[in-house]
């Protein structure tokens, strides 16, 4: 039996992976360096001369990293001892064992794109932790915060809709509840457009009311398994014993506006009784510019709570209460910031895999999670999603993703080719989305 197809890689000149490594990654490193420059006086105020020395050191390390990338130098092992350093360096050795290049060393433009892109963000983190006393500085925080502040109009509309819905949710019949469920799912999907790593850190925010666009956006959903999600969760609700739990896990993607759309979905799941407990999974370190960390999660809820809009503030109060009472649980794990595809989870992070197996449903948000679900490979468009998961089935799962990388499976025959003919960049523009489910039929 043939093995899985080759990984996406920058060795394919002109591909999205190639353009990302050639242009977007150096641009992100430049923005990271600029951010450190801009915070120079803050570092001095907090730490004196040591803060300035640390800023210079971090900039020097990031400049070196940018040079290594742009000149296609060999990928080097991590040096700073951190909880995941050994796993990273073992993975680098594994990548080296796959190569038969002249010097047998993984390089930026030759190795799998998923690996080198994750490695870049891990090296950015290494540059910061090697530079105390600024070693707890989140180099991407201001980009995430700006996305939140620029999306206020949409946030107000969303929170208002949610609070109005909660007043009447007990009175909705099954069909009405299903329609509202589909709405919050679509809000969470299109919230995924706000990805700062795709824009090279340029500002992306949701300035218009997404609620008004849902009907217009429906034709851009290429795979729509929302009915299967409804069947699964409504069945859980109907068969649930009085004291038993229905747990939905959400593997988060971006902070800012997208995180709020995910929290709206999570709130709806509780208030509709489709779920009784939500586990959120975020990143342990700043990642892919806009990914959610524990600090981001808590910061967003606090910002909402202190809003001068009563509905937004009410959401903040309610969500803080969900966290305090344990209905919402935020968790992180180093596996989410490793370069491994998810099919390796049971070997690399058996504790995380075992935790996910206890969920009734897992939502995987966003593009990076989709790439890791499918191994970021050159799959044919019609390959079933179940097959592309390569044995990763901890529980029923669903990818909620707008397309921003050249990997997509589970399409109808001819669907991908038709899109390629009419819109050459359909895979990477963030215009199309999927709800792709894998679980019992």
Swiss-Prot record:
Per its UniProt entry, which superkingdom is the organism in? Eukaryota
User: Which Pfam family, just one, is annotated for this protein?
Assistant: ARMT1-like_dom
This protein's UniProt keywords: Acetylation, DNA damage, Hydrolase, Manganese, Metal-binding, Methyltransferase, Nickel, Phosphoprotein, S-adenosyl-L-methionine, Transferase
The Gene Ontology terms for molecular function here are: fructose 6-phosphate aldolase activity; fructose-1-phosphatase activity; metal ion binding; phosphatase activity; protein carboxyl O-methyltransferase activity; protein-glutamate O-methyltransferase activity; S-adenosylmethionine-dependent methyltransferase activity
* Entry keyword annotation includes Flavoprotein: no
Which SUPFAM superfamilies does the UniProt record give? AF1104-like
Q: Which reaction does it catalyse?
A: beta-D-fructose 1-phosphate + H2O = D-fructose + phosphate; beta-D-fructose 6-phosphate = dihydroxyacetone + D-glyceraldehyde 3-phosphate; L-glutamyl-[protein] + S-adenosyl-L-methionine = [protein]-L-glutamate 5-O-methyl ester + S-adenosyl-L-homocysteine
Sites bearing N-acetylalanine, chain numbering:
2
Q: Which cofactor does it need?
A: Mn(2+); Ni(2+)
Which positions are annotated as binding substrate?
Answer: 253-254, 367-371, 404
**EC number, UniProt record:** 3.1.3.-, 2.1.1.-
Q: Which residues bind S-adenosyl-L-methionine?
A: 258, 291
Q: How is it modified after translation?
A: Automethylated.
Task: Give the N6-acetyllysine positions (modified residues).
Answer: 40
Q: Which residues bind Mn(2+)?
A: 253-254, 291
Q: Which GO terms describe its biological process?
A: DNA damage response; methylation
Q: Where is this motif: Subfamily III RTxK motif?
A: 401-404
Q: Point out residues bearing the modification Phosphoserine.
A: 102
- On whether Manganese is a keyword of this UniProt record, the answer is yes
Q: What is known of its domains?
A: Subfamily III proteins have a conserved RTxK motif about 40-50 residues from the C-terminus; the threonine may be replaced by serine or cysteine.
Query: Main role?
Result: Metal-dependent phosphatase that shows phosphatase activity against several substrates, including fructose-1-phosphate and fructose-6-phosphate. Its preference for fructose-1-phosphate, a strong glycating agent that causes DNA damage rather than a canonical yeast metabolite, suggests a damage-control function in hexose phosphate metabolism. Has also been shown to have O-methyltransferase activity that methylates glutamate residues of target proteins to form gamma-glutamyl methyl ester residues. Possibly methylates PCNA, suggesting it is involved in the DNA damage response.
Put simply, this protein is called: Damage-control phosphatase ARMT1
Give the species this sequence originates from. Bos taurus
- Give the source lineage, highest ranks first: Eukaryota, Metazoa, Chordata, Craniata, Vertebrata
* Gene name per UniProt: ARMT1
